[in-house]
């Protein structure tokens, strides 16, 4: 049996752009994708902390060091520049793999620069 577990997460990223006319997806600074273990073209779930929207799309590699987090296509209607989002990828693991699995949680500052990378989320803690 396989279970779906959090693989990587970029926590509280700031939306830098929303481009309705692009084909689709989310463009993310490649440094952030690497830190979270998320690949270009990988399916991700997005949560918008400002309005509660939850949706899925796939990633596109953005310029390294740019801090870009741009929602493209129809997803651009679900965010505004300056919104705070959480970007999550998931992995399928067998039960024996779960015990050794540690997700990568990337904490960023207001400019989408890496502040810290952790492998757990303490309960009842504001990060």
From Swiss-Prot:
This is Aspartate 1-decarboxylase. GO terms for molecular function: aspartate 1-decarboxylase activity. It catalyses: L-aspartate + H(+) = beta-alanine + CO2. Is synthesized initially as an inactive proenzyme, which is activated by self-cleavage at a specific serine bond to produce a beta-subunit with a hydroxyl group at its C-terminus and an alpha-subunit with a pyruvoyl group at its N-terminus. GO terms for cellular component: cytosol. Its EC number is 4.1.1.11. Catalyzes the pyruvoyl-dependent decarboxylation of aspartate to produce beta-alanine. Signal peptide: none annotated. The active site is at residues 25, 58. The modification Pyruvic acid (Ser) is found at residue 25. InterPro entries: Asp_de-COase-like_dom_sf (IPR009010), Asp_decarbox (IPR003190). SUPFAM superfamilies: ADC-like. Binds 1 pyruvoyl group covalently per subunit. Its main location: cytoplasm. The keyword DNA damage does not apply. It is found in: Cytoplasm. Belongs to the PanD family. Transmembrane segments: none annotated. PANTHER family: ASPARTATE 1-DECARBOXYLASE. Substrate binds at residues 57, 73-75. Pfam families: Asp_decarbox. Its cofactor is pyruvate. Keywords: Autocatalytic cleavage, Cytoplasm, Decarboxylase, Lyase, Pantothenate biosynthesis, Pyruvate, Schiff base, Zymogen.
